[in-house]
């Protein structure tokens, strides 16, 4: 069987199916974490790494041939913005609405109103929260936690189009190897591969996303 299913309008059926399975895994992992039953799905966070790989696969297949044929970096960024930002905005605003509702019903259960609003505005712009609180901890995106992975994916997209899109395979292999070594170090240091969602592990997410994304590009 081919590694990809039948292709329709450059969409791979098999990858779309795996994308859906991974999304469900991430959702179940977050639900399990909230219910303190994460032991039932201890490695569900690895679905995020699959998304990083998938992003590299899709972007390389969809855009590599277009550079030099009328598409430049600005056009690429605009296309990605149109593709991704509606989801960012919807998630951040929905999370903000939930926190505001909690504030109205039980103010003590959420942060002060000013901090809730600041977090909502920053997260809606895909900007990590620069400080935390006793209630939200050190989360980068307290209004919509999963946005952290999209933030790092966007960074990978920008780095790829600015630095790597026209580079040959040997250089990409070097980048992959360096990222793998750094990622392995971070896993050993933190005792887990589940890094990147808070300020304590912010920099550890960089080799994590780089390894997955570049691996996808090479595929």
Task: Set out the residue ranges of the language-model regions.
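Membrane-interface helix termini and inter-helical loops of multi-pass transporters
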Residues: 37-40, 104-109, 191-199
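Transmembrane alpha-helical segments and their boundary/interface "anchor" motifs
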Residues: 45-48, 52, 64-125, 156, ...
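Aromatic-anchored segments of alpha-helical transmembrane domains
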Residues: 24-31, 97-100, 178-191
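Aromatic-enriched alpha-helical transmembrane segments of multi-pass intramembrane proteins
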Residues: 16, 70, 115-219
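Active-site alpha-helix of zinc metalloproteases
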Residues: 25-26, 75, 148-149
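Functionally critical transmembrane alpha-helices in membrane proteins and complexes, commonly lining
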Residues: 10-66, 82-92, 207-208, 213-214
């Amino acid at each position: 069987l081919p590694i990809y299913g039948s292709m329709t309008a450059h969409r791979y059926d098999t990858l779309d199916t795996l994308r859906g399975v991974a999304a469900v895994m991430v959702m179940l992992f977050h639900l399990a974490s909230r219910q303190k039953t994460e032991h039932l799905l201890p490695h569900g966070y690895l679905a995020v790494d699959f998304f990083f790989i998938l992003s590299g696969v899709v972007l390389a297949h969809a855009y590599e041939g277009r550079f030099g044929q009328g598409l430049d970096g600005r056009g690429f960024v605009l296309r990605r913005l149109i593709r991704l930002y509606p989801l960012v905005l919807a998630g951040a605003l929905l999370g903000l609405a939930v926190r505001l509702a909690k504030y109205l019903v039980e103010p003590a259960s959420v942060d002060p109103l000013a901090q809730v609003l600041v977090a909502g505005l920053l997260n809606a712009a895909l900007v990590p929260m620069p400080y935390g609180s006793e209630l939200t901890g050190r989360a980068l995106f307290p209004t919509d936690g999963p946005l952290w992975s999209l933030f790092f994916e966007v960074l990978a997209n920008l780095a790829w189009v600015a630095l790597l899109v026209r580079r040959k395979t040997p250089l990409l292999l070097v980048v992959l190897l360096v990222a793998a070594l750094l990622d392995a170090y971070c896993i050993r240091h933190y005792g887990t591969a589940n890094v990147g969602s808070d300020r304590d592990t912010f920099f550890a997410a960089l080799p994590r996303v780089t390894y997955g994304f570049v691996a996808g590009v090479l595929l």
